[in-house]
């Protein structure tokens, strides 16, 4: 991953041209990051992005163990379920494009967060009551699928709040996303007494904070 990141950096520096006119460019400085962090609207939406990402990583980090070791799925069936949820993210992205023609991003974001929170709560209830498969799989799908709408719209709204510092805003959001994802992944195995409950608790917790 470090090698890929280094290659991406080199391509960005030496291959991809800057498209913004020189007169509109903002010099890179730590002051730009400070200004971005001081903007409350940006911070609010950046936290939505971060905790939405954390919810997804709670699912990613635990799903293999929960479905194969606890629920007894074969590797092939687990791959099918995991792939279906990944397809759900693609469907959510396509749906978001259509919805933006009719509704404001903030309204779509609100509904997506509610769906994600309700579905994550059902995942937790299933984990606490013995993992009935069909409700669990359906709830998991609808806990993951809205993340495309959440991440896309929250990112757009966050950057819109600091248009002149869009690059710094993207950097701050990227840092926050992976910081929260890195923190939530070990928590899955530390709370609730089992990875299934831990996954549900972390998904619900992240979703609730994102809604707030």
For the regions a language model picked out, list residue spans one by one.
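C-terminal membrane-cytosol helix-exit motif in multi-pass small-molecule transporters
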Residues: 2-22
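A late C-terminal transmembrane helix in Major Facilitator Superfamily
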Residues: 157-197, 202-203
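C-terminal transmembrane helical hairpin of 12-TM major facilitator-type secondary transporters
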Residues: 107-154
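Juxtamembrane intracellular "pre-TM" segments in multi-pass secondary transporters
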Residues: 17-48
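Short amphipathic helix-loop junctions that connect adjacent transmembrane helices
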Residues: 62-77
């Amino acid at each position: 991953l470090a090698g890929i990141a280094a290659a991406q950096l080199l391509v960005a520096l030496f291959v991809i041209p800057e498209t913004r006119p020189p007169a509109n460019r903002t010099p890179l400085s730590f002051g730009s990051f400070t200004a971005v962090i001081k903007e409350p609207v940006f911070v609010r939406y950046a936290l939505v992005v971060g905790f939405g990402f954390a919810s997804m990583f709670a699912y990613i980090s635990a799903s293999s163990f929960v479905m194969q070791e606890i629920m007894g799925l074969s590797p092939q069936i687990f791959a099918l379920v995991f792939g279906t949820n990944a397809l759900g993210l693609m469907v959510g992205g396509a749906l978001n494009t259509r919805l933006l023609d009719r509704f404001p991003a903030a309204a779509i974001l609100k509904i997506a967060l509610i769906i994600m929170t309700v579905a994550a709560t059902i995942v937790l209830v299933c984990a606490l009551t013995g993992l009935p498969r069909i409700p669990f799989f359906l709830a998991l799908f609808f806990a993951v699928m809205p993340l495309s709408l959440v991440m896309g719209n929250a990112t757009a709204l966050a950057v819109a709040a600091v248009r002149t510092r869009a690059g710094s805003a993207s950097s701050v959001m990227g840092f926050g996303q992976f910081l929260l994802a890195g923190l939530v992944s070990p928590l899955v195995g530390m709370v609730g007494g089992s990875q299934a409950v831990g996954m549900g608790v972390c998904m619900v917790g992240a979703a609730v904070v994102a809604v707030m």
